Regions:
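Hydrophobic/aromatic-rich core segments of domains that either
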Residues: 96, 112-182
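Short, conserved helix/loop micro-motifs enriched in His/Cys and acidic residues
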Residues: 87-107
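Hydrophobic alpha-helical scaffolding
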Residues: 24, 61, 65, 103-107, ...
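Contiguous, well-ordered alpha-helical segments that form the cores/surfaces of helical PPI scaffolds
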Residues: 76-77, 101-104, 114-119
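Secretory-pathway-linked proteins and extracytosolic
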Residues: 1-76, 80-87
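Short acidic (Asp/Glu) and glycine-rich catalytic loops that position anionic groups and cofactors
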Residues: 51-57, 94-98, 136-137
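Secondary-structure transition/capping motifs at alpha-helix termini
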Residues: 64-69, 81-87, 105-106, 118-129, ...
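Phosphate/nucleotide-binding catalytic core
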Residues: 28-30, 91-94, 115
Length: 182
């Protein structure tokens, strides 16, 4: 009989095992489990795999930039100029159409805008990955009690020659390594 300490099934849970061995069995979720949930999700990982959606989005002059830092900054500016944040937070896409809808309407939540940024950076040959985090407005991140509900924001993380860079395209004013204040 499972007994959850929260209605959110992604939080730590303990269950009583009625098998022959008896006793308590832990069904605790870890941050690795959360990562897997995100990458398996149709609203996050599956969207990132849809490379064909963005293959013709970037102008050729941006694709041709050879310096990786300059290319990443140019892609950031491109997304900032052409897409608008609707002021809704999220670590993933929330519209039915996902990234395709963002490409058509040019408006999306923070997850959609920055997942598009990551997809464009990857399509241009950069080593971009999503970095999912919690904003101050979402509350303190409880690292001892992993829960996907704690996460409400995603930014692009790019490794350029061993140097980490963060990119956030939700604000028209951010630059590399600057995340919009929550």
């Amino acid at each position: 009989r499972a007994e959850l300490n929260s209605s959110n099934v992604t939080k730590t849970a303990q269950a009583y095992d009625n098998s022959d061995s008896g006793g308590f069995k832990s069904y605790a979720i870890t941050w690795k489990d959360i990562r897997k949930q995100l990458y398996d999700s149709q609203y996050f990982g599956e969207e990132l795999k849809r490379k064909s959606l963005v293959k013709d989005v970037l102008p050729q002059d941006i694709k041709n930039i050879e310096n990786a830092e300059e290319k990443a900054a140019a892609i950031l500016k491109f997304v900032q100029k052409n897409y608008t944040w609707n002021k809704n937070y999220g670590e993933a896409v929330q519209e039915e159409g996902g990234i395709r809808s963002l490409l058509n309407t040019k408006v999306g939540n923070s997850g959609e805008i920055n997942l598009l940024l990551i997809m464009l950076m990857k399509s241009a040959g950069l080593e971009a990955e999503p970095l999912v985090l919690a904003t101050i407005r979402n509350g303190l991140l409880m690292d001892h009690s992993p829960s996907i509900a704690q996460l409400n924001y995603v930014v692009a993380f790019v490794d350029i020659k061993g140097k980490p860079f963060l990119y956030d395209a939700t604000s028209k004013l951010t630059v590399p390594n600057m995340i919009r204040p929550s």
